[in-house]
Amino acid sequence: KELGVKIAKVESKSDKDYAVNIKSLVDTKCDLIVSVGFLLDKTTVAAAKENPNVKFAIVDDQPQGAPGNLKPLIFNTAQSSFEAGYLAAALTKTGKVGTFGGMKIPTVTIFMDGFAQGVEYYNKQKGKDVKVLGWNAKSQDGQFVPQPDPFQNVAGGKSTAQTLLNQGADIILPVAGNAGNGALQAVKASGGKSNVIWVDADGCKTQAAYCDNIITSVYKGMDVAVFDAVKAVKDGKFNGDPYIGSLADKGTGLSDFHPFDS
């Protein structure tokens, strides 16, 4: 509204919809087409190459071989996840914290790496031995939601979280999209014995029913990144250089602590 632009939205139900949906936006004569996520990588690159006069941006991905009319909007969530790991290590009562992902892809494991590194740093600084369950940053092995459709598999997210809880973790960082709701269900059922650190957006706003179990959230400033891309198109200043959100520019960080702010 602030920029006075019209918005057209399409939602993909499966990967078969990716190319069709992007083509529909091209046919609508959109000046900028924004896709979201690693899974749309190849389709977005192909569309950008086929339509050099259309501007594209992709959130949460940095495609290889992208043309100059495609701008990656990415976030250094390793920085904020590091803070989340340090915080979790400081708050755990069991000496064990956990994390799991939706799929083993870079935009997921960057959170898990940062989280594990934050715990490791806490241990070094405080002389502690807090364990990270669900992810080994050195071997890049860990827990992921089972197929099919792991980012939507809430039941799979719940069972994966429950495994970590059963192993003694009392704080979990789920990096699994909608499947992360399963982790919220699992910790809520624990009766106050465990909690979650949410990702992507402020969980107390997006998952309000579970706010009492959300310590904080590792957010991405996706709204700011997309706004800036739209403004750049309108001002004639758009280019394909990656936007990289960091702690320094508040492109990522930890949200408010809400009930845990004490």
Range-by-range predicted roles:
Residues 1-262:
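A residue-level marker of the well-folded mature domains of exported/periplasmic proteins
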